[in-house]
């Protein structure tokens, strides 16, 4: 049987591995406690060591936590409006282009990219460069400093020009601040998107949890996008965010 004694070391290793992978401390602690609760008292097959069975239980628990089903993008509207949210530098603009390309090539949609970041220098130009590289039209109003108006006008433009999907790229900030949250809330309320996505840099580590929670409390987003997984990240942010906000990781 599995007992506290014969799996104590393995559980310690599991917790250390989670912390090394940037999983939030409390979540790592709760996770191992849950695995331990399920494991204690289980019969071990003669061919297995208690530690080996525990590894299987850890894998099962991770699968259950992350959700076995693939969550797609909601494209029900006409046009379908997708709102991007997240901190500055998380990769919203680049991902907006990747999503537009995916919807255009794989789903046969006519996509409009909308530049609503009126603060960051060259944000609008960046979206144009991205749009040009994938042959997707970009809507912007460089003189207009009201992102709500820009987004609303873009949707009107999309309706009258036969676009199926509108992807709204919004401004990020270096940290969560009230002004930024109020602005994206106003945009969200005005355009009523079918899909609100929270884009997070997977290398953010522990802090990703607090940011995700703040955005989710204000926008009740539909899914998470993890960027920069090709860096030196260990992906712990995925586990932490999924646990805290219980929203699917879509890409």
What are these regions (language model features)?
Residues 1-116, 123-144, 150-170:
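Primarily NTPase-proximal linker/entry elements flanking Walker-type ATP/GTP-binding cores
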Residues 89-90, 119-121, 145-147, 172-176, ...:
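Short, small-residue-enriched loops and turns at beta-alpha junctions
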Residues 152-155, 163, 175, 184-189, ...:
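Conserved phosphate-handling catalytic cores of large alpha/beta enzymes
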Residues 9-12, 25, 120, 204, ...:
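Low-complexity, compositionally biased segments
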Residues 101, 129-130, 182-186, 214:
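Glycine-rich, phosphate-binding/catalytic loops in enzymes
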């Amino acid at each position: 049987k599995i007992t506290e004694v014969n799996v104590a070391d393995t559980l310690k290793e599991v917790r250390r591995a989670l912390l090394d992978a940037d999983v939030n401390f409390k979540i790592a602690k709760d996770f191992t406690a849950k695995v331990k609760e399920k494991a204690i008292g289980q019969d071990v097959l003669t061919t297995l060591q208690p530690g080996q069975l525990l590894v299987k239980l850890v894998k099962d628990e991770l699968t259950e936590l992350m959700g076995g089903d693939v969550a797609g993008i909601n494209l029900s509207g006409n046009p379908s409006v997708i709102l991007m949210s997240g901190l500055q530098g998380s990769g919203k603009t680049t991902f907006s282009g990747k999503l537009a390309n995916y919807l255009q090539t794989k789903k046969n949609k006519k996509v409009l990219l909308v530049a609503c970041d009126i603060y960051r220098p060259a944000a609008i130009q960046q979206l144009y460069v991205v749009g040009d590289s994938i042959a997707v039209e970009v809507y912007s109003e460089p003189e207009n400093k009201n992102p709500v108006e820009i987004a609303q006008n873009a949707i009107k433009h999309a309706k009258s020009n036969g676009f199926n999907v509108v992807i709204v790229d919004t401004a990020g900030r270096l940290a969560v601040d009230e002004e930024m949250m109020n602005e994206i809330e106003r945009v969200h309320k005005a355009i009523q998107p079918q899909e609100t996505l929270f884009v997070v840099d997977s290398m953010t580590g522990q802090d990703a949890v607090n940011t995700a929670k703040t955005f989710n409390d204000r926008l009740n987003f539909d899914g998470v996008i993890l960027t920069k997984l090709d860096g030196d990240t260990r992906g712990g942010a995925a586990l932490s965010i999924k646990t805290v906000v219980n929203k699917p990781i879509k890409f």
